[in-house]
Design a protein with these regions (language model features):
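Conserved catalytic cores of very large enzyme subunits
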Residues: 1-289
Length: 289
């Protein structure tokens, strides 16, 4: 069985019972007899019988940028575009949970879509302090206040992501199987903010998360994938310091895994993107033209 599922938990037991019903109906009714026999004889393995009776899919890439920027609807409620980094992190984890409850495989989120919301938080704090202390405090002091508040919100937001993913339960009886794609795109106007976010994600993963006994352990999720490019490949690039942190993190916590942006561009027509959850990559879509 899936080792991510704790069979002592009531919600997981319900999922496992439903899975056995699905397997039975799949073998007896849905599959051709020769496929069922081949599966039983070990000639082949028919995957995911425990979900086959439902019209749901396996893995996906979440279009998190569109859902955050333009808002989305969950449970019949409109979720508007966030006005701060903390709220963006919370909304993102709710989307992850909703997606995990509607499929049975992994999912991936590109964290670079969070950068603009960290800047929104900075702009909000800067406006607040400027209006409150204009002419009373030097601009550089105001910037120190802004930096302190932004760093606090950054830590809290990333902690929200880590705690939510590791504590939320979904309808398939486990925490969301999710990958965070850590990509510093040189063309991204929010690359500075995203560098801060990725660095904080790595720092918190390096620290680990406390178990029920208060001991720091390595969380199973989110899986982390770190993209290596010219500016962070330990060749004197601007973001080499983040890569060095990533290597320390991998040595202690097994993640992140690494992807070469150069090879991705060669193999996928100039595109750099995450696998869906763990290892399956989509191919570039083309129509008949």
């Amino acid at each position: 069985e899936n080792s991510n599922k704790n069979a002592y938990v009531a919600s997981t037991q319900r999922d496992l019972i439903a899975g056995e019903v699905s397997k039975d109906l799949t073998k007896r009714i849905l599959l051709p007899e020769k496929i069922t026999k081949a599966h039983e004889d070990g000639v082949l393995h028919f995957h995911d019988m425990d979900y086959f009776i439902q019209p749901i899919f396996n893995c996906c890439l979440i279009n998190i940028g569109d859902m955050l920027d333009n808002g989305t609807v969950m449970n019949g409620k409109l979720i508007e575009s966030p006005k701060s980094f903390q709220v963006a992190c919370t909304v993102m984890t709710q989307i992850i949970s909703a997606v995990a409850s509607s499929q049975y495989g992994g999912q991936s989120v590109d964290t670079r879509h969070l950068g603009k919301y960290l800047r929104k938080s900075a702009d909000k704090y800067r406006k607040h302090y400027t209006e409150r202390y204009a002419g009373k405090i030097a601009p550089d002091i105001i910037e120190e206040f802004v930096k302190e508040r932004v760093n606090d919100e950054l830590r809290s937001g990333v902690q929200t992501i880590q705690y939510q993913i590791n504590t939320l339960m979904t309808t398939n009886g486990q925490s969301p199987f999710v990958t965070l794609f850590l990509n510093l795109d040189p063309k991204d106007e929010y690359i500075k903010e995203n560098a801060m976010i990725i660095e904080e994600i790595l720092r918190q993963r390096l620290e680990g998360i406390k178990n029920e006994k208060g001991v720091y352990v390595t969380p199973a999720f989110p899986k982390l994938i770190y993209v290596l490019d010219e500016h962070n490949a330990l060749k004197g690039g601007e973001y080499d310091y983040i890569t060095k942190l990533a290597v320390r993190c991998s040595a202690k916590r097994m993640y992140p895994d690494y992807i070469s942006a150069k090879k991705m561009r060669e193999n996928y027509e100039g595109n750099v993107f995450s696998p869906m959850g763990c290892r399956s990559f989509l191919v570039p879509w083309k129509d008949e033209n």
